[in-house]
Amino acid sequence: MKVLALRHSVAQVYADTQTYVHDDSKDEYENAFLISNLTTHNILYLNYSVKTLKILNKSGIAAIEIQSPDELFTLIRCNFTYNYENNTVYLHDYSYYTNNEIRTDQHWVTKTDITNYLLPGWKLTYVGYNGKNTRGHYKFSFICQNAATDDDIIIEYIYSNELDFQTFLLRKIKERMTTSLPITRLSNRVFRDKLFSSILNTHKKVINVGPRNESMFTFLNLPTIKQFSNGAYLVKHTIKLKQERWLGKRVSQFDIGQYKNMLNVITTIYYYYNLHFSKPIIYMLGSAPSYWIYDIKQYSDFTFETWDPLDTPYSTTHHKELFFDKDINRLKDNSILYIDIRTDRGNMDWKEWRKVVEHQTISNLNIAYKYLSTGKAKVCCVKLTAMDLELPVTTKLLHHPTTEVRSEFYAILDVWDVNTIKRFVPKGVFYAFINNVITENVFIQPPFKLKTSSNDYIVALYALSNDFNSRQDVINLINQQKQSLITVRMNNTFRDEPKVNFKNIYDWTFLPTDFETKGSIITSYDGCLGIFGLSISLSSKPTGNNHLFIINGTDKYYKLDQYANHMGISRRSHQIRFSESATSYSGYIFRDLSNNNFNLIGTNVENSVSGHVYNALIYYRYNYAFDLKRWIYLHSIGKANVEGGRYYEHAPIELIYACRSAKEFAILQDDLTVLRYANEIERYINIVYNITYADDPNYFIGIEFTNIPYEYDVKVPHLTLGVLFISDNMINDVITVLKKMKPELFKMEISTSYTYMLSDNIYVANASGVLSTYFKLYNMFYRSHITFGQSRMFIPHITLSFSNRQMVRIESTRLKISSIYLRKIKGETVFDMSE
């Protein structure tokens, strides 16, 4: 959903678009709530309130002021992520395909021969980090850039087994044009940048678990973050390999040697960060042309000092010369050294060339060892070739993708490796490594152990659900870690599957009720965005690849109606009710009937069940941005701080009724996951609320009327407004509550329209207009620790006779209250009040 705020209506009609005019009779929160439950994708918001826009954005719903037709046309035709704190829009718009154009935000790609393999007549355009170079295309009242690129296709091709790039590109573009937009992947880079800068403003020590290559630029400027990944491939791991021969396989049609070198250096940078938590100087030998340095400098300001007889245009300091052993003393501490020296083969015979390469490999290793043998805070990444070698057993082996699989690979060494025991590795084993192992991640840090860290803020995005982790250990970490943002895969199955297949692994699935957290927010991706200053135009869909975002230790926990709130809670219900269901009242009818309340007159205005909780349960796959457990808990302890809107505090029994309705809904839908979720939410309600029932009552509250439009044979027909189980010394407490409620009690617009047999020999009249006041009265008694109401649903009725009678229907008749009293069952009246 996107909300585009206009001062004036527009003449043009757009598909999937609805107009909402600000309702001045309602406050900004109520307007925001009504907007959020509209069912179209585009909302044109007229006569808008800036505060309402702010409320929507905090809820993760993109809402932007529009000042021109061009702004409207641009935003209505595509999806986007919005940084509402600095008024920047990141478009995810692929309409540039109509210019016969693909885009990249990695400069090195433009220096390859990739254009020879594009679709006929197509070109490649460099657009800068997150499309920053496109800002000049949009002369808008807000900052706007198009973050959409085709780097995902290019990178997927590089790691695939396919060689024909044009065929691969064509298939992927067609897929993109015929499937829904992977909105979270597109906005994730924007989110990660905002997230980690926000966290580091308030937390000095941050742990990040499970980063992948898509984050490789994000953390270049954040050296103090401690990374955990899947670990490195070490020399000692080669013992499992069987010897092989040279393969000579082509990986890419266009030259990706630049990409390989960039990955090698970035891997080394992050390895250095995890040791020293600061930025190193970067020395490079055999550096030309290293166009990728430009890419790294777009994200962070590194000092590159390079040696090569050829130019290295983006280096900070370039020595246009060869590097010799005597130059090692020029290399400072707090640095990394990348050795990529190799002489061109020219016309050399392959045997002679092989000797040169092996000699150069030994020379490269000697430079590395000498560099690491003195000084401090040093890491080296060195090019090696498959040959008989002795290497430290803790050497980290790298084999990032390159244009052709030949004989080369790389090794990362640190000052500790130099003094570690060495192992002889034969040439054939190195070929087995080269032929079979691809380094898929620039993050080669050790795996994260599922233990709390009291002084650290832990971030684990899409990293802990894998079934090689203990599910209970993941739950324990989330329950016990004081400060964190952790995601887990949401249980989106209908059979309540404990784990699901994802790509080539299995993930555990989770529901919010799996966690016993207090002070945590459990929400969706878009709900989490709102907490960190972003919003999005396309809300999470139940794709099966959905995650719960669990935020521990946030100062926004008590801001119940601002973040992870109830915005959009009824949107899915509206979509169904007004398009597919038997009636738009179907939800109200079902909730009453499933709780044995058969009086459906006015069910849409006087329902006996919490619609919020019911919708949050049965449609949790669509509206899990709303943190239901937090909402229940804060109400239970009386700390539901609400800024605005039509606020109605539910009685705890209404929440129980909602769970019962949701369970029956789940049974009818054969939805075992909702069934368990509803059961567990009901159990949670009973834990946080101390609900007691007057199932063996000794007092009741009665209402007498001046007019009863039916025949009756009881002495005085009355409406029982509720029963109590109290001791005699609590009578005054009950009377105090009744006196406080007196104005509302006498304002009740009670009416009746039919009679029926409540049970054998009990003939009653229905009573409408009672429930909302009953639940308010229930809440007041609950807060006063007075047992009021039974475990079965309260059905308002007036007893007319204790004999069988025929049903009577009349026009709805208003009943006037004459008195309200408290009476002991089979005893005397102890309190009576009249208007």
Curated annotation (Swiss-Prot):
InterPro entries: VP3_Rotav
UniProt subcellular location: Virion
Keyword Membrane: no
Catalytic activity: a 5'-end diphospho-ribonucleoside in mRNA + GTP + H(+) = a 5'-end (5'-triphosphoguanosine)-ribonucleoside in mRNA + diphosphate; a 5'-end (5'-triphosphoguanosine)-ribonucleoside in mRNA + S-adenosyl-L-methionine = a 5'-end (N(7)-methyl 5'-triphosphoguanosine)-ribonucleoside in mRNA + S-adenosyl-L-homocysteine; 5'-triphosphoadenylyl-(2'->5')-adenylyl-(2'->5')-adenosine + 2 H2O = 2 AMP + ATP + 2 H(+)
Keywords assigned by UniProt, alphabetized: GTP-binding, Host-virus interaction, Hydrolase, Inhibition of host innate immune response by virus, Methyltransferase, mRNA capping, mRNA processing, Multifunctional enzyme, Nucleotide-binding, Nucleotidyltransferase, RNA-binding, S-adenosyl-L-methionine, Transferase, Viral immunoevasion, Virion
Keyword GTP-binding assigned: yes
Region listing for N7-methyltransferase activity, in residue ranges: 171-245, 429-555
GO biological process terms, semicolon-separated: symbiont-mediated suppression of host innate immune response; viral process
A Pfam family that the UniProt record links to this protein: Rotavirus_VP3
The EC number(s) this enzyme carries: 3.1.4.-, 2.7.7.50, 2.1.1.56
UniProt region (GTase/RTPase activity), positions on chain: 556-692
GO CC annotation terms, alphabetical: viral nucleocapsid
Residue ranges, annotated region (2'-5'-phosphodiesterase activity): 693-835
Residues passing through the membrane, by range: none
Superkingdom, taxonomy of origin: Viruses
Region (2'-O-methyltransferase activity): 246-428
Active site location: H718 (for 2'-5'-phosphodiesterase activity), T720 (for 2'-5'-phosphodiesterase activity), H797 (for 2'-5'-phosphodiesterase activity), T799 (for 2'-5'-phosphodiesterase activity)
GO function terms (MF aspect): GTP binding; hydrolase activity; mRNA 5'-cap (guanine-N7-)-methyltransferase activity; mRNA guanylyltransferase activity; RNA binding
Function summary: Multifunctional enzyme involved in mRNA capping. Catalyzes the formation of the 5' cap structure on the viral plus-strand transcripts. Specifically binds to GTP and displays guanylyltransferase and methyltransferase activities. Has affinity for ssRNA but not for dsRNA. Capping activity is non-specific and caps RNAs that initiate with either a G or an A residue. Together with VP1 polymerase, forms a VP1-VP3 complex positioned near the channels situated at each of the five-fold vertices of the core. Counteracts the host innate immune response thanks to its phosphodiesterase that degrades the 5'-triphosphorylated, 2'-5' linked adenylate oligomers produced by the host cell IFN-inducible 2',5'-oligoadenylate synthetase (OAS). The host RNaseL is therefore not activated.
Subunit structure: Interacts with VP1. Interacts with VP2.
Description of its domains: Contains a bipartite N7-methyltransferase domain, a 2'-O-methyltransferase domain and a GTase/RTPase domain. The C-terminus contains a phosphodiesterase domain that degrades the 5'-triphosphorylated, 2'-5' linked adenylate oligomers produced by the host cell in response to IFN stimulation.
Family: Belongs to the rotavirus VP3 family.
Protein name per UniProt: Protein VP3
